Amino acid sequence: MTGLFIIALGAGGIKPCVSAFMGDQIPNKSPQLMTKAFNAFYWAINLGSFFSFLVIPAMEQHYGYSWAFAVPGIFMGIATFVFWLGRKKYHRTPPERNNGRAGFWKVLFIVLFHGGWKNAEQRCGASAVEDARHILKILSIFVFIIPFWSIFEQTASSWVAQGSRMIPLSIPLPGGGDWSIGPAQIQAANPIFVMVFIPLITVFVYPKVVTLARPLVRLGTGLALSSVTFLIVAFLQYRLEGGASMSIAWQLIPYCVLTISEILHSTTGLEFAYTQAPLHLKSVITSFWNLTIFAGNMLVAAITFFLSNGESANAISTDRFILYAILAAVVAVAYSFRARRYGKTE
């Protein structure tokens, strides 16, 4: 638990700041360059994820858990040192002093319990109220992202359970023998697809499909694709429940669609959080974006608990997958109406 707490503490500190820091390094902040930069940033994240799937299990198998945990720690130390070496070359945005301005939560508390926006402006100042309104406007978009993470995070749970009922994929090795790909190994398809699709989408799709140049459109398209993903998963589950014998390679189809949805969501969400936030609130807004991941996990946990009467064994079914597909579709439709009213504030 101590290790998990320290990891959570470190992740909570770096995640809201690293993407904002990366955005600060872009000189002219052009929309096209920002999109490419955040796509490259997310590509690098998945490169590390891919090697974790590839190297760490082998490290544990041959050298034990001690080295499996030590090697990532050593590389993190090296990365921190390399990052420190470039400290004099980075563009730094110094933190803005509070200067007596009330924070978001104080403004929100006054709005809800002590007389609304007018009273909040009198007690906290116009600039603090303007910041609070801006944050709430962005959060009105973020709230629609929560169901996506409820779907995406199931690749490590319900998809694994489904894959355990499928036939492992055997790939012949040059030196003899086979490499067996089971439900745990098939998850590596996600970072591989991300690294393949991000350059293709950035270079060929975005310049050709003009509507996808708008972040709000990309977010909505990603939501719709997540619904399609679970329709495919539901079909696979329907075949399995009917007694069909299926290779786990069939899961590559929903992984492919979900990865495209993820690219449209995650890279765009980080870009949207950075470009929409005021200068002094960029890390704060990004932290709210990361909070949608937590909320998505809590949502799927609640749905599983209530519909399964607390028994996770009932969580894998065709009906359950269809339920999530419908949820994503309904949210995508609702999001489309909110996105139209959001207005362009970039």
Where are these regions (language model features)?
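Hydrophobic core of transmembrane alpha-helices in multi-pass small-molecule transporters
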Residues: M1-I14, T229, V233-L264
